[in-house]
């Protein structure tokens, strides 16, 4: 099926032919680009349609309403985030398997925060649509699956306590969510070297409850406890 723009009363739309699936993807890509700059409010189908060279009527064949498109953009953000977490945890191997396991979860947590630093408007769109949308929630759950897989590997390596469930680790999630919120809502500057160090040390401190004695040893040797507690005000 090929769809094309048509002339409208508001003005002529430059015709551009799309295969059925391609038009849907083009709409999502343009909506995502707008959300990354200005957030959810920038996702307006009647403005997107002429920008990509089709009529609003053609665009609405793919999305019954604006909210469906917003949810696609939010879900796509979680797909991107899962990809970033996966990339962040592919690091250089270290001789200590306990430290390697610790670093893997540390880097994954930092990747989640860094996404909000890099993409604050997109991250806001994701969070604001997480509750009401089953589609968005399903994609968001992929983050939990990825992090739990990391935890399971860490349990096998002896870094994390047996039976740790990532969803139940409130101190670590409080750190991840709190730091992400500061970034996405512009509460504090997050791009400075000092902010980066404090972010990493906050994650280190809030991982404490997950760790075995060996995990604590590896953490404190690689990321000295004196530095962690000093920044935390301990």
Language-model features and meaning:
Residues 26, 30, 34-68, 72:
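Helix-turn-helix
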Residues 72, 86-121, 132, 169-172:
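Hydrophobic alpha-helical connector segments
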Residues 110-114, 155, 205-209:
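Helix-loop "lid/cap" segments that line or gate small-molecule binding pockets
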Residues 124, 128, 133-137, 141, ...:
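Hydrophobic/aromatic-rich alpha-helical bundle segments in the mid-to-C-terminal region
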């Amino acid at each position: 099926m090929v769809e094309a723009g048509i002339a409208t009363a508001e003005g002529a739309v430059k015709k551009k032919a799309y295969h059925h699936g391609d038009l849907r993807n083009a709409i999502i890509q343009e909506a995502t680009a707008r959300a990354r700059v200005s957030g959810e409010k920038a996702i307006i189908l009647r403005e997107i349609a002429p920008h990509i060279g089709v009529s609003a009527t053609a665009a609405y064949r793919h999305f019954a309403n604006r909210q469906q498109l917003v949810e696609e953009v939010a879900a796509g953000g979680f797909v991107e985030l899962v990809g970033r977490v996966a990339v962040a945890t592919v690091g250089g191997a270290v001789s200590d398997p306990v430290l390697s396991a610790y670093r893997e979860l540390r880097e994954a947590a930092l990747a989640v925060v860094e996404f909000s630093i890099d993409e604050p408007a997109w991250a806001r769109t994701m969070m604001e649509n997480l509750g009401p949308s089953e589609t968005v929630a399903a994609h968001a759950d992929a983050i939990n699956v990825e992090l739990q897989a990391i935890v399971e590997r860490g349990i096998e390596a002896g870094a994390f306590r047996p039976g740790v469930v990532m969803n139940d680790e409130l101190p670590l999630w409080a750190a991840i969510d709190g730091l992400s919120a500061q970034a996405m809502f512009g509460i504090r500057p997050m791009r400075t070297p000092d902010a980066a160090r404090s972010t990493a040390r906050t994650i280190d401190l809030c991982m404490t409850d997950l760790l075995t004695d060996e995990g604590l040893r590896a953490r404190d040797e690689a990321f000295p406890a004196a530095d962690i507690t000093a920044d935390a005000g301990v």
